[in-house]
C-alpha cells in the first residue's frame, strides 16, 4: 500500500497547468492524467526495486537494464531501496480488481515509478516505459498512466511444421510479442503439405515433426528441429518476458509426419495425413508421444497450456473423432495442463460427449465451430477467425498480408467470423490470436518474408486486443506510430537502416584469393531494397564465389560451377542465368 501512496503523492505534486498529452505507445494506454513538464532521465542511472519486492522483481529489473542498453545505449544499475530522483522505481502493491494480474500504474514526476499488483503488470509497465522513452527521445511526460488489458489472451500462432524457423528466430519473436504486450505464442510443431502438389503420393508429400524425440528415433525432422533443451529454454524465456509459449501437437489429422514414421497407424480410407482411429496401435503411439513431453518432474512442456490440434478430420467419422478428442483432452489434463484444441464440433456433430470444462477452443471457422453453442457448453474460446486473422504466405487464398486498416478501424475481438459477433465482455471469450500457416511447403518464403507480414499485424492486433474498444487515434496516426516503433530492444529482423552506412577500412580493390572481403557497418538491409553491381566473370574461373553475405542470406557468383548467379536464404536457393563470358552491367536483384 505504501508504494501506491508514494506514486499517488507523486501525482498530486504535479502542476495542474499545461497538462502533458498522453504518451504514444502500442497498445495505447487505457487512462492518462497529464502533469506539467517532462522528466529527463539520465543516460546513466539506477533501477531501484522496493526492498520487500526484490525476489519478485529482480528479473524484471535485469531485463529492463539490458533493454535500456540495447534500445537507447543507456547504462543502468539495479539495486534495492527507496525511490530516488531521476531513477526508475519498481514495486508491488495490493490486489486491484481492475488492474488484475497484468495491469499497472506508471507515474513520472521526480522519478519514474511503476507499480502493480503482480510481477507481470510491472513487466508490462516497463514495456510502456521503454516505448515512451524511445518515442520521446529519452524523456517522460509527467503524469500518471493506469493501464490494463481488456482481454487476458492475446496471441500469435506460427506453423513451424511445414516450414522450419530457427530457434534464434523464435526467441527473438518472444521478445517482439512481449514488447507489444502480446502474451501467447503458439508453436504448431507438426504438419504436412498437400498431397496433390506431390504427385498425389503420400510417400513423397512433405511432412515434419520439429521436436527431438528419444522414444521414437527417426521421427524428428532432419531438415530442421529443436532439441528438448532448446524448447524448454524457449519456454523459460517466454516466462521471463510474460509470453506463454504453447506447444501444439496436431492430431488426428495433419499427422503425416507420424504416419511417415509409423505407416501402420495411417488411415487407408481418408488419407495418410489422418490417423486411423480404429487401431489400438494409434492410441499407444499417441499416448507415448504425449507422455514423453508431459511426464516427469521437469517435463519438456513446462507451461500451463498444451494444444492437441483436432482440426479438419473427415466428417464421416464424427463419433469416433469425438471419442478420440475427448480421450486426449482428459489424457493431457491428467498431467496438470490446461488443454486447447481447434474448433471442430459444429462440423463433426454427434452424440458422443466431448469434455468442455477447462478446455479452450480456437474459434477459427464458421463451418467448424459454433461460438455461442461452445460457450453454452462450457468451453472458453479464443478468436482465431480464418477470414480476418490467417496469413498464408503466397498461397493465393486466405490473406498474404492482413488488412491492417480494416482491423484497426472495424475489427473487434467479438467478431469471431463473418456472420457472428459476440458482445464485448461475453463470459468465456478470452481474446484473440492471429496465425501464420505455411501451407505451400518450399515456396520460396523465408523467415524474414514471414516477419515482414506478421510484424504490422502484431502491432495492430496488440492494440485491438489490449484496449478492446474504439481506436485512440486515426489509422493514419496509428500507422505513422507503427512505422517509427522498433521491433523490440536489440532486434532488427526487418533490417531497417538508420544513419550512414560506411565501409570500415575501405579498399580500392580486393585480392581475388578467395578469402579477402570488405564489411559494412550494417549486417543486412530489409525490404524494400534493390542491389546493383557489375560482374566481370573470369572465363577460366571455375569455382563458386560469394559476392555478398549477411546473417540470413548470401549472393553467389557461379553457383555450383554452373555459371549462375544465385540468391540463397536459409534453405531456399534462387538462381539466375547470366552470360558466362561478358560483363553484365546493372544486373538488378530485387
Which residue stretches match the model-derived regions?
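Conserved, mostly hydrophobic/aromatic
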Residues: 47, 68, 118, 156, ...
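Bacterial Sec-dependent N-terminal signal peptides
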Residues: 1-22
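Flexible, acidic glycine-rich loops studded with aromatic residues
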Residues: 354-359, 366-508
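Active-site neighborhood of glycoside hydrolase catalytic domains
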Residues: 258-360, 364-378
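Extracellular glycan-recognition modules
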Residues: 502-573
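Acidic, contiguous N-terminal accessory segments
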Residues: 17-149, 339-348, 355-357, 487, ...
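Feature activates predominantly on carbohydrate-active enzymes
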Residues: 97-274, 281, 287-305, 438-440
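Short, aromatic/His-centered strand-loop micro-motif at the edge of beta-sheets
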Residues: 567-589
Amino acid at each position: 500500500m505504501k508504494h501506491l501512496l508514494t506514486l499517488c503523492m507523486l501525482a498530486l505534486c504535479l502542476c495542474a497547468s499545461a497538462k502533458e498529452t498522453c504518451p504514444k505507445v502500442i497498445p495505447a494506454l487505457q487512462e492518462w492524467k497529464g502533469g506539467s513538464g517532462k522528466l529527463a532521465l539520465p543516460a546513466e542511472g539506477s533501477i531501484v526495486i522496493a526492498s520487500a519486492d526484490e525476489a519478485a522483481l529482480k528479473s524484471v529489473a535485469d531485463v529492463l537494464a539490458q533493454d535500456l542498453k540495447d534500445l537507447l545505449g543507456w547504462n543502468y544499475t539495479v539495486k534495492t531501496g527507496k525511490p530516488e530522483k531521476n531513477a526508475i522505481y519498481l514495486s508491488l502493491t495490493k490486489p486491484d480488481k481492475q488492474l488484475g494480474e497484468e495491469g499497472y500504474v506508471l507515474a513520472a514526476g521526480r522519478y519514474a515509478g511503476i507499480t502493480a499488483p503482480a510481477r507481470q503488470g510491472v513487466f508490462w509497465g516497463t514495456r510502456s516505459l521503454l516505448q515512451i522513452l524511445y518515442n520521446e527521445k529519452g524523456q517522460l511526460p509527467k503524469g500518471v498512466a493506469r493501464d490494463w488489458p481488456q482481454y487476458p489472451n492475446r496471441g500469435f500462432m506460427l506453423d513451424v511444421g511445414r516450414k522450419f524457423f530457427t530457434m534464434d528466430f523464435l526467441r527473438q519473436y518472444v521478445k517482439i510479442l512481449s514488447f507489444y504486450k502480446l502474451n501467447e505464442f503458439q508453436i504448431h510443431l507438426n504438419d504436412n503439405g498437400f498431397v496433390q502438389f506431390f504427385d498425389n503420393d503420400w510417400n513423397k508429400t512433405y511432412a515434419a515433426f520439429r521436436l527431438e524425440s528419444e522414444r521414437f528415433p527417426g521421427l524428428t525432422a532432419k531438415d530442421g528441429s529443436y532439441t528438448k533443451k532448446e524448447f524448454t529454454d524457449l519456454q523459460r524465456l517466454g516466462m521471463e518476458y510474460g509470453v506463454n509459449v504453447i506447444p501444439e501437437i496436431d492430431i488426428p489429422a495433419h499427422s503425416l509426419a507420424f504416419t511417415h514414421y509409423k505407416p501402420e497407424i495411417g488411415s487407408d480410407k481418408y488419407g495418410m495425413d489422418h490417423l486411423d482411429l480404429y487401431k489400438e496401435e494409434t492410441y499407444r503411439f499417441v499416448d507415448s508421444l504425449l507422455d514423453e513431453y508431459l511426464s516427469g518432474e521437469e517435463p519438456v512442456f513446462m507451461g500451463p497450456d498444451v494444444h492437441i490440434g483436432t482440426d479438419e478430420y473427415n466428417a464421416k467419422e464424427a463419433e469416433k473423432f469425438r471419442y478420440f478428442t475427448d480421450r486426449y483432452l482428459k489424457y493431457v489434463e491428467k498431467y496438470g495442463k490446461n488443454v486447447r484444441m481447434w474448433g471442430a464440433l459444429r462440423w463433426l456433430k454427434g452424440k458422443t460427449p466431448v469434455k468442455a470444462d477447462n478446455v479452450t477452443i480456437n474459434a477459427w471457422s464458421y463451418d467448424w465451430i459454433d461460438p455461442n453453442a461452445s460457450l453454452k457448453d462450457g468451453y472458453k474460446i479464443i478468436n482465431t477467425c480464418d477470414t480476418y486473422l490467417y496469413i498464408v504466405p503466397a498461397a493465393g487464398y486466405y490473406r498474404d498480408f492482413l488488412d491492417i486498416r480494416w482491423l484497426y478501424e472495424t475489427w473487434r475481438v467479438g467478431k469471431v467470423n463473418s456472420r457472428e459477433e459476440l458482445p464485448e465482455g461475453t463470459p468465456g471469450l478470452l481474446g484473440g490470436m492471429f496465425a501464420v500457416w505455411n501451407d505451400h511447403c518450399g515456396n520460396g518464403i523465408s523467415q524474414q518474408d514471414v516477419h515482414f507480414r506478421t510484424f504490422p499485424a502484431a502491432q495492430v492486433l496488440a492494440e485491438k486486443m489490449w484496449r478492446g474498444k474504439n481506436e485512440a487515434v486515426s489509422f493514419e496516426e496509428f500507422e505513422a506510430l507503427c512505422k517509427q516503433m522498433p521491433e523490440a530492444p536489440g532486434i532488427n529482423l526487418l533490417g531497417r537502416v538508420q544513419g550512414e552506412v560506411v565501409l570500415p577500412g575501405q579498399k580500392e580493390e580486393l585480392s581475388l584469393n578467395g578469402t579477402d572481403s570488405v564489411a559494412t557497418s550494417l549486417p543486412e538491409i530489409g525490404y524494400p531494397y534493390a542491389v546493383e553491381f557489375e560482374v566481370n566473370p573470369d572465363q577460366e574461373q571455375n569455382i563458386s564465389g560469394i559476392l555478398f553475405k549477411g546473417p540470413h542470406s548470401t549472393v553467389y557468383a557461379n553457383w555450383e560451377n554452373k555459371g549462375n548467379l544465385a540468391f540463397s536464404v536459409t534453405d531456399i536457393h534462387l538462381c539466375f542465368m547470366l552470360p558466362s563470358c561478358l560483363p553484365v552491367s546493372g544486373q538488378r536483384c530485387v
